[in-house]
């Protein structure tokens, strides 16, 4: 099924250089989509560090369970992704599928099975024909290329209308560091640790425990701060890989000053990808950013912001171009957070509509 490209989509896929120690290839399994790649294989330099954030759902996909276990070792040498089938709610057969695909990747790339990370996205509840996928892996391992980002980003899409990628260059000491990521997401987008699939690669030399801290704290204001339909997916996965190929200075902690520029670059890539996902929300016509100031805490501000963003009445007002500010006040009230009505102000863009608990003098909602 051909999907009409989102009106909020960027004009072109960004030009993104390769990351040393990362190569990839794609293939067509034909399990669901015809004439387009739906398999992605990524080979990573030996001793690559990995960090991840995964869905909090009580019914996670089989690949999510696999990744959760493998993340404990903090090392990766391969990533394999299939689209079209989420491998969720598939019982023991789903777990078998993950194991057999990982074994095939391990054999093709000559790496430990425990260093292979997996992800799936697509229809829930359908058994994954892993035997058909496995036949594609040997050829994929022979066609690995560096900087294959557009094809890689396309292979992991489902109902997306455009592939998503972002890249930044940062400094660690005097070393230039590449940070490049791809993502997919269109439906079931709601902040719950991670939100969709995203894979970020860097050539920085960062231990997995420090990498995990950097990823976890930057998820909060990027992937964890977006919503389209308020539904959290069963397959949400964000993985961050650091090959160490740049031979940069090894940081002593996540707060080491040497990582300041790197963390800014990482956050930029994550925020860019998160916004692209919102722009590709199913049926999306507008991108709205909710800013909350003056709350008792960041946690409180976040809860209020999400109450506004997820409100059906606020969404319909925005969709209809109706500046119904009362619905925003309603959403603040239902958030469950403490709010002083006499101090609430509401602005749409640069226009102040209500201030200190009352509509501003002379405001007219009529067009």
Please tell me what each predicted stretch does.
Residues 2-82, 86-99, 106-367:
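A structural signal for small-residue-enriched, beta-sheet-centric alpha/beta enzyme cores
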């Amino acid at each position: 099924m051909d999907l009409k490209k989102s009106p909020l989509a960027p004009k072109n896929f960004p030009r993104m250089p390769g990351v040393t120690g990362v190569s990839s290839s794609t293939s067509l399994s034909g399990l669901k989509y015809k004439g387009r790649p739906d398999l992605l294989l990524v080979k990573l330099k030996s001793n690559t560090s990995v960090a991840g954030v995964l869905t909090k759902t009580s019914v996670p996909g089989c690949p999510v369970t696999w990744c959760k276990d493998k993340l404990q070792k903090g090392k990766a040498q391969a990533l394999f992704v299939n689209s079209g089938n989420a491998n969720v709610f598939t019982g023991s057969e789903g777990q078998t599928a993950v194991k057999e695909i990982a074994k095939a990747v391990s054999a093709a790339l000559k790496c430990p099975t425990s260093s292979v990370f997996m992800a799936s996205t697509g229809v829930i509840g359908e058994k994954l024909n892993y035997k058909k996928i496995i036949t594609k892996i040997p050829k994929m391992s022979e066609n690995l290329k560096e900087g294959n980002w557009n094809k890689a980003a396309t292979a992991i899409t489902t109902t997306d209308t455009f592939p998503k990628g972002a890249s930044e260059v940062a400094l660690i000491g005097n070393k230039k560091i590449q940070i490049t990521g791809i993502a997919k997401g269109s439906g079931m987008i709601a902040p719950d640790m991670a939100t969709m699939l995203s894979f970020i690669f860097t050539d920085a030399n960062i231990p997995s425990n420090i990498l995990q801290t950097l990823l976890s704290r930057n998820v909060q204001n990027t992937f964890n701060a977006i919503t389209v339909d308020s539904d959290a997916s069963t397959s949400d996965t964000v993985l961050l890989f650091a090959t160490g190929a740049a031979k940069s200075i090894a940081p002593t902690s996540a707060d080491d000053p040497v990582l300041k520029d790197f963390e800014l670059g990482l956050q930029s890539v994550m925020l860019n990808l998160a916004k692209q996902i919102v722009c590709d929300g199913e049926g999306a016509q507008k991108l709205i950013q909710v800013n909350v100031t003056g709350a008792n805490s960041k946690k409180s501000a976040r809860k209020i912001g999400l109450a506004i963003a997820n409100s059906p009445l606020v969404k319909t007002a925005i969709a209809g171009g109706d500046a119904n500010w009362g619905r925003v006040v309603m959403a603040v009230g239902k958030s469950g957070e403490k709010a002083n009505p006499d101090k609430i102000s509401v602005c749409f863009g640069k226009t102040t509509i209500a201030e200190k608990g009352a509509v501003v003098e002379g405001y007219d909602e009529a067009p």
